[in-house]
Swiss-Prot record:
This is Toxin ParE1. Forms a ParD1(2)-ParE1(2) heterotetramer. PANTHER family: TOXIN PARE1, TOXIN PARE1-RELATED. Belongs to the RelE toxin family. Toxic component of a type II toxin-antitoxin (TA) system. Its toxic effect is neutralized by coexpression with cognate antitoxin ParD1 but no other ParD or RelB antitoxin. Low levels of wild-type toxin in the absence of antitoxin decreases the rate of cell growth, and results in death or loss of colony formation abilities and greatly elongated cells. Low levels of a mutant missing the last 4 residues leads to loss of cell division while cell elongation continues. InterPro entries: ParE1/4, RelE/ParE_toxin, RelE/ParE_toxin_dom_sf, TA_system_RelE-like_toxin. Disruption phenotype: No visible phenotype when deleted singly or as the parDE1 operon. It comes from Caulobacter vibrioides (strain ATCC 19089 / CIP 103742 / CB 15). Coiled coil: none annotated.
Length: 96
């Protein structure tokens, strides 16, 4: 597994996802969804090429869907998780 790092924005995204999920569906569902997102991030670190390249967004960026969200990342010496955005969000506006 490659080491990985969450950007400050990715950490904030995950916190916001937790808060929304907890308020909307309760603690148990929020915890389940958080585990699903974490498992996706760990899978990306284990298999960095699994995500789809998103060169139109930014050079070197990749994307991988997880539930209703998309994990945006890039691969170098380590995997950098850049953002975790809802699939309905305009990624270009949030990553541009």
């Amino acid at each position: 597994m490659k080491p990985y790092r969450l950007s400050r924005r990715a950490k904030a995204d995950l916190d916001d996802i937790w808060t929304y999920s907890e308020q909307r569906w309760g603690v148990e569902q929020a915890a389940d969804y958080a585990r699903e997102l974490q498992a996706t991030i760990e899978m990306i670190a284990e298999h960095p090429g699994m995500g789809q390249p998103d060169e139109n967004l930014r050079a070197g960026y990749r994307r991988c869907a997880s539930g209703s969200h998309v994990v945006f990342y890039r691969v170098g010496v380590r995997v950098e998780i850049i953002r975790v955005l809802h699939q309905s969000m305009n990624a270009r506006a949030h990553l541009g």
